[in-house]
Swiss-Prot record:
InterPro entries assigned to the protein according to its UniProt record, in alphabetical order: MoaC, MoaC_bact/euk, MoaC_sf, MoCo_biosynth_MoaA/MoaC, Mopterin_CF_biosynth-C_dom
CDD domains (UniProt xref): MoaC_PE
Signal peptide (residue range): none
Function: Catalyzes the conversion of (8S)-3',8-cyclo-7,8-dihydroguanosine 5'-triphosphate to cyclic pyranopterin monophosphate (cPMP).
Pathway given in the UniProt record: Cofactor biosynthesis; molybdopterin biosynthesis
GO biological process: Mo-molybdopterin cofactor biosynthetic process
Family the entry assigns: Belongs to the MoaC family.
Self-association and partners: Homohexamer; trimer of dimers.
Catalytically driven reaction(s): (8S)-3',8-cyclo-7,8-dihydroguanosine 5'-triphosphate = cyclic pyranopterin phosphate + diphosphate
Protein name: Cyclic pyranopterin monophosphate synthase
Length: 161
């Protein structure tokens, strides 16, 4: 069973030891999205939602999620993050889709891909939570890693769809 990195000799879960790895600058950006109806879109851009500023709250949720990733992903190392940025862009060409990009960085011994993915997911979930009173039919779209840099495995950039 030793060919599995997160399973010990007894077949039980373990978190890998990264103490011998080099400290390098590591960055990851993840994408998620949520498609809403026109009324929700208008509430968000006009800042008229009864629960408050939807995008500011969602940004805070994404930041908190990145910082707490190791508490919800079992084999994820707790990291000292040095930067977290949540960015939004509306696509209103055929629907009302809010595209979310979460960028996380650190100087450390392991990457921040899971932190970026968790941040993007929590941001979309928070938009849903704050607007679900108007419509429960919103759709959270694909969540995926866009880029990562640093570390032994090198850089990654997702191919365009």
């Amino acid at each position: 069973m030793s060919e599995f990195t997160h399973i010990n000799e007894q077949g039980n879960a373990k978190m890998i030891d990264v103490s011998e790895k080099e400290i390098t600058k590591r960055t990851a950006t993840a994408h998620s999205s949520i498609t809403v109806n026109q009324d929700i879109y208008q509430q968000i851009v006009d800042h008229t939602n009864k629960k408050g500023n939807v995008l500011n709250t969602a940004q805070i949720a994404g930041i908190m999620a990145a910082k707490n990733t190791s508490t919800i992903i079992p084999m994820c190392h707790p990291l000292s993050l040095t930067g977290i940025d949540i960015a939004f862009e509306w696509d209103t060409t055929s629907s009302y889709t809010l595209n979310i990009e979460a960028t996380v960085s650190t100087s450390g011994k392991t990457g921040v891909e899971m932190e970026a993915l968790t941040a993007a997911s929590a941001t979309a979930l928070t938009v849903y939570d704050m607007t679900k009173a108007l419509d429960k039919g919103m759709v959270i779209g694909e969540t995926y890693l866009l880029t990562k840099s640093g570390g032994k495995s090198g850089d990654y950039r997702r191919e365009s769809k």
